[in-house]
Amino acid sequence: MKIYTCKLMIFLWVIGGLLVAGCERKEVMEYEGVDGIYFDVQYGASHGNESLWARQNYTYVSFGTLEAEEADVTMKVGISGSIKDYDRPFRVEIVQDSTNAIPEEEYTGFTEEQVIKAGENHAYVTLKVFRTARLTHDTARIQFRIEPGEHFTLPFSEVGQIPGRWNDTKTQFATGGDPAVHDVFFNNILQRPLGWGANEY
């Protein structure tokens, strides 16, 4: 029995050595080319976290469920490609023909000039939106579009399911799904909660 165990151990060592010798070390190729940039806004269930939430095509602020007269909106912009050791500016513009929100009255605090800072792979675009009288019967919309500049390109026409993230993209408002574009919708209309019948509302 002892000889059998010894032969088995030798056999396993020989097989292990052959497997290791058969391995070939390959270098991981570095990304080459212009890095991509896109809106990577995420939100979802409170029991999750940002790394798991699905990518969303729009942000919705419902003043009907808030007591506040204003709300902060944060939109994450991500990159595909390499992290750099220097700042990389880009622009975000408001698409006027797809926007009906009134500047300074219904939103403020937005800056077109943005930057992906050195050592980072994302940035946050922020603004503040306000409750106004017309929002009790109308929905305001602001459409934002990325202008990539010299450091980035817009390589995607759409972004599908991102591995490791939940697949619960919201569809209450129709959007084109272009990752270079993000819409912000806000109103003061109380929506019927999911699961409520018409006679309970």
Residue positions per predicted region:
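Short proline/glycine- and polar residue-rich coil/turn motifs
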Residues: 114-122
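Bacterial N-terminal signal peptides that target proteins for export
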Residues: 1-10
